[in-house]
Design a protein with these regions (language model features):
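Bacterial N-terminal signal peptides
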Residues: 8-16
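A residue-level marker of the well-folded mature domains of exported/periplasmic proteins
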Residues: 21-363
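Positively charged n-region of N-terminal signal peptides that target proteins for export
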Residues: 1-9
Length: 363
């Protein structure tokens, strides 16, 4: 009887040990992913990529972002809450480049790796951002300028002081690094193309509008070509639509040749103001104006397919999310990490169904 009891006790202890060990093994590293939002299709694709990486690398993640990309303080609170959960690493897409500096100093002091995604944090404390997973936004927007220039070059060359022309760049805000880079990339590339490939020069160009997008070396005295940098009153859809409508109201008077919308929100604003883009072709006032968008979504894809837009720039949001979590995991494991360019491509009605493009343009 005693022998049987000893055996039973031993079995119970062994079973408890096994269960305890399994419990320990099942505890996964936790990575906090703090996004700029979840409201746009773009962020849903980023989230899918992040979740896939979490599955592949055996980590638990939370993915959260504020209701609107103007809710900077809400994002800061989300980051604070995530830090309180003791993550092994953090992936961050900062809405405002200066709003999270204190938190980044804390993570650096605590040795918590932070990976930037979608946009960087230029003023971040040195060493606090371990790597970034993002599109080269400056180059991607430069691609948009090149595509637009091909179509409007002749009309630019015809510009005069008596009849100047205007190119409009619509940016959702003037604080996010990704949008700032896009606006500046389009601006600089268009200036370079006009200066090098037409009879005009930089002295004929003026960059006007939101001062965050006017560099110290931007031409501001020209009177033949105006590049206007527009930022809506807020990131709200109504403000994006109102800003787009204000531009459309001046197409004839300002001789606007083209509009570049630098993200999905500004695209949606323009589409809302033009009956999903149909007015851009049905109204003779807009028919010769060139529009290029950014990212995708069902409505934007439809505008490209129907040639309301010349085309759009697509990123790879799935890879942005995936690489953000992958880099965060590798940093936690002590591996060396570096910036990853997740790429961008121009798509139009002719190539949007090609295999290398189709998988990037989400609905």
């Amino acid at each position: 009887m005693k022998k049987t009891l000893v055996v039973l006790v031993a079995l119970v202890v062994l079973a408890s040990t096994v269960l305890f060990a399994e419990g320990v093994q099942e505890k996964k590293p936790y990575i906090a992913v703090v996004s700029k939002g979840e409201q746009h299709d773009f962020w849903q694709q980023v989230k899918l990529g992040a979740n896939a990486a979490a599955e592949d690398f055996g980590v638990d993640i939370t993915f959260e972002g504020p209701p609107s990309e103007s809710d900077v303080q809400i994002q800061v609170e989300m980051l604070n809450n995530a830090m309180a959960k003791n993550p092994v690493a953090i992936a961050l897409a900062a809405l405002n480049t200066s709003s999270v500096l204190d938190q980044l100093q804390q993570t650096k002091n605590q040795g918590i790796p932070v990976i930037g995604f979608d946009s960087g944090v230029p003023e971040a404390p040195e060493g606090s951002i371990w790597a970034n997973a993002s599109t080269n936004n400056y180059a991607a927007a430069g691609m948009a300028a090149e595509k637009m220039f091909e179509v409007i070059k002749g009309r630019i060359e015809s510009a005069s002081i008596a009849k100047p022309v205007k190119i409009v760049v619509m940016n959702q805000d003037a604080s996010g690094e990704s949008l700032l880079s896009r606006g500046k990339g389009f601006r600089d590339t268009m200036i370079k193309l006009i200066d090098e490939k037409t009879a005009l020069s930089k002295s004929d160009i003026s960059v006007i509008g939101n001062t965050a997008y006017i560099a110290s070396d931007s031409p501001t005295k020209g009177r033949k070509v105006f590049i206007e940098m527009i930022v809506p009153a807020s990131a709200a859809m109504t403000d994006a639509t109102n800003a787009a409508q204000a531009v459309l109201n001046k197409v004839s008077s300002d001789n606007i040749l083209g509009i570049f919308c630098s993200n999905e929100a500004t695209v949606k604003g323009l589409l809302a103001a033009t009956n999903d883009g149909a007015t851009l072709k049905s109204n003779a006032t807009f028919r010769d104006m060139v529009v290029i968008g950014y990212d995708a979504g069902a409505a934007q894809k439809n505008a490209v397919r129907n040639q309301y837009f010349l085309g759009s720039i697509t990123q790879d949001p799935y890879q942005i999310g995936y690489k953000a979590v992958e880099l965060a995991y590798k940093a936690y494991k002590g591996e060396s990490v570096s910036d990853v360019d997740t790429g961008a491509k121009f798509y139009n009605y002719q190539n949007m169904d090609d295999p290398d493009i189709k998988g990037l343009i989400y609905d």
